[in-house]
């Protein structure tokens, strides 16, 4: 009865490649909205729009805990 032990909540994370930077969002512009191409897993090849906190640039690899949710588009008020 060997159970698989998870040491980190991020073990199920999926790698994604930043392919386009769409803009900044958040009250102080601390979040960057980017398009990410999923590199592995069941959604391999899918392009998602996600919000990323912290420094990010084209070509960066981002680890996604889940690949089902997408961020809403940035709209001008």
Curated annotation (Swiss-Prot):
NCBIfam families: PRK04007.1 (NF003080). This is Small ribosomal subunit protein eS28. Pfam families: Ribosomal_S28e (PF01200). One of its GO terms (molecular function) is structural constituent of ribosome. GO terms for biological process: maturation of SSU-rRNA; ribosomal small subunit assembly; translation. The keyword Ribonucleoprotein applies. The gene is rps28e. Belongs to the eukaryotic ribosomal protein eS28 family. It comes from the Archaea. The keyword Ribosomal protein applies. Gene3D superfamilies: Nucleic acid-binding proteins. Keywords: Ribonucleoprotein, Ribosomal protein. One of its GO terms (cellular component) is cytosolic small ribosomal subunit.
């Amino acid at each position: 009865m060997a159970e698989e032990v998870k040491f980190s909540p991020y073990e199920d994370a999926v790698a994604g490649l930043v392919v386009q930077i769409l803009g900044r969002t958040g009250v102080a512009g601390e979040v960057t909205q980017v398009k990410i191409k999923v590199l592995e897993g069941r959604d391999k090849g899918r392009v998602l729009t996600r919000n990323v906190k912290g420094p990010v640039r084209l070509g960066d690899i981002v680890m996604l805990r889940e690949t089902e949710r997408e961020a809403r588009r940035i709209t001008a008020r």
